[in-house]
Amino acid sequence: MTYIQHYDAPLGRILLAADEVGLTGLWFDGAKYFADGLPAEHTERETPVLSEARRWLDLYFAGQEPGFLPPLHPAGSTFQQAVWALLLQIPYGQTVTYGELARQLAEKQGRPRMSAQAVGGAVGHNKISIIIPCHRVVGTGGSLTGYGGGIDRKVKLLALEQADMTRFFVPKTGTALL
């Protein structure tokens, strides 16, 4: 069974989804892939997993590094799961490029190289935004490329984490505006 709750964050309303194992989704209302993978049958109810996710978000939006993760249970391909596991290793307030993430994954899998575009596709389909920190991935040279919740939110999330914002820019055209 899937359970949902809404969370009113400073950057907009968030839909949380969980099963008995862990958090399965976290989306800003109106996000590009809003409620992607959410079963048609779900119940709005407090659960221990959702309570932990809300506690994590409370700390995060208070400007604190939470220091723990709620139980996570995102559905995805083996490749997506590998990329999302790497996202969880990006420290609070720091960023990596899609290319760096691709190199890390290639090294971990014993491959000579990995497509940054393929990694970007997996990053873009992350169903547990913020907690699995896809907002910490930037384009080469500091380009703030696409974020499902919107570039304005990506900028605000990085600023909340006190990332060095002087290194980043928003391109005038392209996927950054998605």
Can you name each region flagged by the protein language model?
Residues 1-24:
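DNA-contacting interfaces and partner/effector-binding or oligomerization modules
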Residues 5-10, 64-178:
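Nucleic acid-binding interface residues in structured DNA/RNA-binding domains
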Residues 15-16, 25, 97, 146:
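A sequence-level detector of short linear motifs
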Residues 18-69:
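Compact structured core domains
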